[in-house]
Each structure stands twice: as structure tokens, then as C-alpha cells.
């Protein structure tokens, strides 16, 4: 790797844009966590995985916010702490994103259910929290985390550019898993979509025969489950700018300091939680309706009942009785 270039200077407007992205991502991740806590009938396995991804994104956005706000000029104790937190959260986010894609593949294509799915989720926890934690502890112990001159970040601390083996540690603390995700996520996504298309074709051929229970069973892949397929696409669109700047840094190109790339990198690394919130809260009718009713303090519209009639069941109760197990809300 060539000698480190002069530090990338962050302009005030660039810092403001990235700070706004961090704040929106933290707010979005917080909303996803809140909806999971408020409405138990929406707690399917798929949304539980989304909850863990949101927790990682929330920690990531908070640590990035502090780093961009401080705009470190050298390695300090808070630089190392911020770099460690963001490294752990960011790497964990990579693992949870792949875990969601793998869950979709196994549950939709392989129709994995029951105890085997529970064991799979425990394995997701062990890998998605344990591996990033081990890598982060090793990086901190060996003093690899520190000031990076914003050439592979946007104001926050990551791998110290003065470390001789900095490329190896950049790969271990994020880039290796990011690049593997670029391969695994589209592959799993294509397999899931191929299976869904085949299922739709089969249903269209036999629709006159199987309109009852089999048709309902075929619709167990709910709209929310299909929306989870978009997570890999969002991941790639957001993260690719970070990879571009990493490659430019390896090549010693001055283009790494291009303002547009810097801003796209800053937004891409920090806005995952906001993007997930848009898709799974604001664009999900069941969640959006409840959230707006809660914010506006307005009861959900219902038909008028005569005096003395039994009170209609609450939202959670009515949907709980109709809800198919393990199918996220739409």
C-alpha cells in the first residue's frame, strides 16, 4: 500500500450531511426497535432478525455521529473507543444482513421450520455478535485502531494508517466481510426470487383446483417477507461507495478526496437503519397505521356499534387471531 496521502479535509457542509444521515439512521433504527416492543403480534422470526440488525445499525450510527462530530486529528482514547464501537457494530451489521438473506433462503426455498430454525437463530447470534467482538478485541489489543486521516472513513476513526499491516486489518475489520456480502447476498436473493416465481407459476396453473387451504399456504411468504429481500439491495447500494474509496486508497489515488465520494461514503455507511425504517415502518401499512394512530392519539376507525354491544377487540388482539405464525406483518 502506498504512503498515506494528506488527510482528507471535511468541509462543513459535508460534515452536516453525514451528521444528518447518522441522526436519521439512529431515529429509524429506534423506530424499528420501538415497533417490535409495542406490538407483540408483529414479532415474527423475520422481524426478530430485523430487530437485531437495527440494534447493530443504531450503535453504528451513534458511534459514527460522535466520530464525525469530533473530526479527530490524531489517535486519542475516545478515537480508539469510537473506532472500536463502530468496527464492532459495522461488522455485526454485515453478518446480520447476510443472516437475514440466509434465513429467507432456508425458510422460503428449503422450507425450514420448527426447532431447526430456532437452532439456526442461535447460530446467527453466536456468529453475528461473537465474530465481530473477537475481531474488535484483537484490533484494540494490538493497537490497530486509531486515526485514519478520513481516507477510508468520513471523520471517524478506524484502522490506524501508520500500522504496517493496515491493509490486513482493514480487511479483517470490515472490508473482507463487506466484499463477501457483495457475492453472497445477490446469490441468495436470486435463488429466493427464482423459487418465488416458480411458486407463483404453479399456483396460476392450479388456481381453479387449490383455492382453499393450499392457496393460503402458498401465500405464507407474506409481503413483509418479500420486502426483506430488498435488504441486500439496499446494503449494496449504500456500501459500494465505501469500497470504492478503499480501493482508491490502496491505489494512492487523489480521487479518494473527491467531495461527492466522501459524502456518498458518509451516507452509505450511516444510513442503513434509516433505509430499513422507510421500508419496514413507513412503507408497511400495518405498522404505519398503528404508528400514525399512536402519534396522533387517534383511535383506529371502526364501525359504529349499538349501545350495549360488546367492545370490538383491540388491534393487536384482532390481528393476533388472524395472523399466520412466523409471517411478518405487511
Curated annotation (Swiss-Prot):
Residues 301-330 are annotated as: Disordered. One of its GO terms (cellular component) is ciliary membrane. PROSITE patterns: G_PROTEIN_RECEP_F2_4. GO terms for molecular function: G protein-coupled receptor activity. The keyword ATP-binding does not apply. Its main location: membrane. Residues 1-15, 70-87, 141-166, 249-259 are extracellular. Expressed in the primary cilia of radial glial progenitors (RGPs) in the developing neocortex. Keywords: Cell membrane, Cell projection, Developmental protein, Differentiation, G-protein coupled receptor, Membrane, Receptor, Transducer, Transmembrane, Transmembrane helix. Residues 37-48, 109-119, 188-227, 281-330 are cytoplasmic. The chain crosses the membrane at residues 16-36, 49-69, 88-108, 120-140, 167-187, 228-248, 260-280. GO terms for biological process: cell surface receptor signaling pathway; circadian behavior; phospholipase C-activating G protein-coupled receptor signaling pathway; radial glial cell differentiation. It is a multi-pass membrane protein. It comes from the Eukaryota. Residues 317-330 have a biased composition (Basic and acidic residues). InterPro entries: GCR1-cAMP_receptor, GPCR_2-like_7TM, GPCR_2_secretin-like, GPCR_Rhodpsn_7TM. It is found in: Cell projection, Cilium membrane. Orphan receptor that promotes neuronal differentiation of radial glial progenitors (RGPs). The activity of this receptor is mediated by a G(q)-protein that activates a phosphatidylinositol-calcium second messenger. PANTHER family: G PROTEIN-COUPLED RECEPTOR 157-RELATED (PTHR23112), G-PROTEIN COUPLED RECEPTOR 157 (PTHR23112:SF47). Belongs to the G-protein coupled receptor 2 family. This is G-protein coupled receptor 157. It comes from Mus musculus. The lineage of its organism: Eukaryota, Metazoa, Chordata, Craniata, Vertebrata. The gene is Gpr157.
Amino acid at each position: 500500500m502506498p504512503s498515506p496521502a494528506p488527510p482528507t479535509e471535511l468541509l462543513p457542509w459535508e460534515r452536516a450531511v453525514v451528521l444528518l444521515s447518522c441522526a436519521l439512521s439512529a431515529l429509524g433504527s429506534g423506530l424499528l426497535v420501538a415497533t417490535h416492543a409495542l406490538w407483540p403480534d408483529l414479532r415474527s422470526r423475520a422481524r426478530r432478525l430485523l430487530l437485531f440488525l437495527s440494534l447493530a445499525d443504531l450503535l453504528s450510527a451513534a458511534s459514527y455521529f460522535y466520530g464525525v462530530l469530533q473530526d479527530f486529528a490524531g489517535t486519542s482514547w475516545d478515537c480508539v473507543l469510537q473506532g472500536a464501537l463502530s468496527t464492532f457494530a459495522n461488522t455485526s451489521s454485515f453478518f446480520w444482513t447476510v443472516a437475514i438473506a440466509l434465513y429467507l433462503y432456508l425458510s422460503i426455498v428449503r422450507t425450514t421450520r420448527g426447532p431447526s430454525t430456532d437452532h439456526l437463530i442461535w447460530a446467527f447470534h453466536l456468529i453475528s455478535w461473537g465474530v465481530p467482538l473477537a475481531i474488535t478485541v484483537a484490533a484494540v489489543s494490538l493497537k490497530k485502531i486509531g486515526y485514519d486521516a478520513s481516507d477510508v472513513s468520513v471523520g471517524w476513526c478506524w484502522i490506524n494508517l501508520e500500522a504496517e499491516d493496515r491493509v490486513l486489518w482493514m480487511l479483517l475489520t470490515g472490508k473482507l466481510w463487506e466484499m463477501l456480502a457483495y457475492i453472497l447476498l445477490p446469490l441468495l436473493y436470486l435463488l429466493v426470487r427464482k423459487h418465488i416465481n416458480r411458486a407463483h407459476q404453479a399456483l396460476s396453473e392450479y388456481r381453479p383446483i387449490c383455492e382453499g387451504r393450499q392457496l393460503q399456504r402458498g401465500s405464507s411468504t407474506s409481503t413483509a417477507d418479500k420486502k426483506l429481500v430488498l435488504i441486500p439491495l439496499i446494503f449494496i447500494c449504500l456500501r459500494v461507495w465505501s469500497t470504492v474509496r478503499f480501493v482508491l486508497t490502496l491505489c494512492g489515488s487523489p480521487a479518494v478526496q473527491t467531495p461527492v465520494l466522501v459524502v456518498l461514503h458518509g451516507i452509505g455507511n450511516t444510513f442503513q437503519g434509516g433505509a430499513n425504517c422507510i421500508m419496514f415502518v413507513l412503507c408497511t401499512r400495518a405498522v404505519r397505521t398503528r404508528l400514525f394512530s399512536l402519534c396522533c392519539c387517534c383511535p383506529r376507525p371502526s364501525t359504529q356499534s349499538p349501545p350495549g354491544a360488546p367492545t370490538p377487540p383491540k388491534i393487536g388482539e384482532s390481528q393476533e387471531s388472524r395472523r399466520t405464525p412466523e409471517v411478518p406483518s405487511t
